């Protein structure tokens, strides 16, 4: 086939067609009740009536993966970064009590590599399966003048639904509520500009560096995918009146826990009430960071926090354990005097 004008401009249309064929099997495994239409339609569709909600409220979220992508590109490992993208979106809307319904992805790249694109979308589909969301659409944009041939960016968008009376807002959290923390897998998807600076600029480590405190090579630790909390937390929401949920992302405990509070409330976080993952101690040491800086930037081993009444603590923990989750009572809600987040106790190793 003769090279057309678009190809001469650096856009490989044929490679785009190959990507569509390669990803069909991954998209197919994310099908769920309510999803409509087929891959390749102009718009993704979802039948909201299939949920039989009386007063449905739609909750949307969008996010990317940040500079964690640079590690995936440098390591040439692209099959889990899509999980991160899904996690960052669905965990956010879960914080409002919403069940994720569908997801769309956007990949921008300098050169369309069908094998690489399939790996990325496979990760997105894996994340959608974990979240119970249908992958109903997406876009792969080849822009050779915007990106290098090996570079790409990844972003996602999700929509979920919740009954209006069950929508979780900041006004529901009360003084005396207990904070229950659910573990993270590691750094998740925030703070990677600092992470990369600490390890690869300041300390000049290599991707495959072996650090005694870690049980895997450094890059493997740093690319561990963000946990998706949808299924266990939705099970809790069926049985417990959860007053607040925080997705611990960029800004760590200090920035995120107050997002579920009104201005007259604060949280006391008991340090030492959960195991801090080794990677955080490693970063603290290599980056010469103090403990409070760590809690202002990273999740420190807790990726999601639920606020529940004291009477519901035992049942909440039971449901989480029944759904394969470790969970920890990490603090309580109190009246605010100065800071919105108060740390007490000491770090648990």
Swiss-Prot record:
InterPro entries: PurM-like_C_dom, PurM-like_C_sf, PurM-like_N, PurM-like_N_sf, PurM_cligase. GO terms for biological process: 'de novo' IMP biosynthetic process; adenine biosynthetic process. It catalyses: 2-formamido-N(1)-(5-O-phospho-beta-D-ribosyl)acetamidine + ATP = 5-amino-1-(5-phospho-beta-D-ribosyl)imidazole + ADP + phosphate + H(+). The lineage of its organism: Bacteria, Bacillati, Bacillota, Bacilli, Bacillales. It comes from Listeria monocytogenes serotype 4a (strain HCC23). Its main location: cytoplasm. It is found in: Cytoplasm. This is Phosphoribosylformylglycinamidine cyclo-ligase. One of its GO terms (cellular component) is cytosol. The gene is purM.
């Amino acid at each position: 086939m003769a090279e057309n004008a678009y190809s001469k401009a650096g856009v490989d249309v044929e490679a785009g067609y190959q990507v569509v064929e390669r990803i069909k099997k991954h998209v197919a495994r994310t099908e769920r009740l309510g999803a409509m239409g087929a891959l390749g339609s102009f718009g993704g569709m979802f039948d909201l009536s299939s949920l039989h909600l009386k007063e449905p409220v739609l909750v949307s979220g969008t996010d990317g993966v940040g500079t964690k992508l640079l590690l995936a590109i440098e390591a040439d490992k692209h099959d889990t970064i899509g999980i991160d993208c899904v996690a960052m979106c669905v965990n956010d809307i879960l914080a409002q009590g919403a069940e994720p319904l569908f997801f769309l992805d956007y990949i921008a790249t300098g050169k369309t590599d069908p094998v690489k694109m399939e790996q990325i979308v496979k990760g997105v589909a894996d994340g959608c399966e974990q979240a119970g969301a249908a992958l109903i659409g997406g876009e792969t944009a080849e822009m050779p003048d915007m990106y290098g041939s090996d570079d790409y960016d990844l972003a996602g968008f999700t929509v979920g639904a919740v009954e209006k009376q069950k929508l979780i807002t900041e006004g529901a959290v009360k003084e005396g509520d207990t904070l229950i923390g659910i573990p993270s897998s590691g750094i998740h998807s925030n703070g990677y500009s600092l992470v990369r600076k600490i390890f690869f600029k300041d300390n000049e480590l290599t991707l495959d560096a072996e650090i005694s405190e870690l049980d895997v090579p450094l890059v493997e630790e740093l690319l561990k995918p963000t946990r998706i909390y949808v299924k266990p937390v939705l099970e809790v929401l069926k049985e417990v009146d959860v007053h607040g949920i925080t997705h611990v992302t960029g800004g760590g405990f200090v920035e995120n826990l107050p997002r579920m509070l009104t201005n007259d409330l604060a949280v006391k976080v008991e340090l030492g009430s959960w195991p801090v993952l080794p990677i955080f101690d490693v970063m603290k040491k290599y980056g010469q960071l103090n403990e409070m800086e760590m809690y202002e930037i990273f999740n420190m081993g807790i990726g999601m926090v639920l606020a529940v009444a004291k009477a519901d603590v035992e049942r909440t923990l039971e449901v989480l354990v029944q759904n394969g989750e470790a969970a920890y009572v990490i603090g309580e809600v109190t009246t605010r005097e100065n800071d919105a987040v108060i740390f007490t106790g000491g770090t648990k190793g």
